[in-house]
Amino acid sequence: MGLTSQLLPPLFFLLACAGNFAHGHNCHIALREIIETLNSLTEQKTLCTKLTITDILAASKNTTEKETFCRAATVLRQFYSHHEKDTRCLGATAQQFHRHKQLIRFLKRLDRNLWGLAGLNSCPVKEANQSTLEDFLERLKTIMREKYSKCSS
């Protein structure tokens, strides 16, 4: 069952309108989800949140906002890819194991949303200062809250 040529123009028009509508609301929706994810992440105290991560936020003075989001997503992806099965993070109890799996799930969600805001395919990340994941997420949450307040006004 193929689409007739009469249906194609209205479908493309609807897709274009939906894309413009979503882009206008992207600021509020994406930022709200990022902030909620960051709130959940910073409340969690797991073995992995004390591990170090490349702190691209400390050296982001001469970068655009999109580059900062892209680099944050990149270092988060490197972190959770490296530590997903790390025995130091998995813990000895079932509760620690569950918290770790939840942490990884939240980091993946945050990564996906930051990539969406960045809109870039890739970005280089140079080795910089290190900080704990916990501190990195707190600083990222502050940045996102500031952006959300600008977006809302």
UniProtKB/Swiss-Prot annotation:
Disulfide bonds join 27-151, 48-89, 70-123. Pfam families: IL4. GO terms for biological process: B cell activation; immune response; interleukin-4-mediated signaling pathway; negative regulation of inflammatory response; positive regulation of DNA-templated transcription; positive regulation of macroautophagy; regulation of immune response. InterPro entries: 4_helix_cytokine-like_core (IPR009079), IL-4 (IPR002354), IL-4/IL-13 (IPR001325), IL-4/IL-13_CS (IPR018096). It is found in: Secreted. GO terms for molecular function: cytokine activity; growth factor activity; interleukin-4 receptor binding. GO terms for cellular component: extracellular space. Residues 1-24 form the signal peptide. Glycans are attached at residues 62, 129. PROSITE patterns: INTERLEUKIN_4_13 (PS00838). Its main location: secreted. Coiled coil: none annotated. Keywords: B-cell activation, Cytokine, Disulfide bond, Glycoprotein, Growth factor, Secreted, Signal. Belongs to the IL-4/IL-13 family. Participates in at least several B-cell activation processes as well as of other cell types. It is a costimulator of DNA-synthesis. It induces the expression of class II MHC molecules on resting B-cells. It enhances both secretion and cell surface expression of IgE and IgG1. It also regulates the expression of the low affinity Fc receptor for IgE (CD23) on both lymphocytes and monocytes. Positively regulates IL31RA expression in macrophages. Stimulates autophagy in dendritic cells by interfering with mTORC1 signaling and through the induction of RUFY4. This is Interleukin-4. The lineage of its organism: Eukaryota, Metazoa, Chordata, Craniata, Vertebrata.
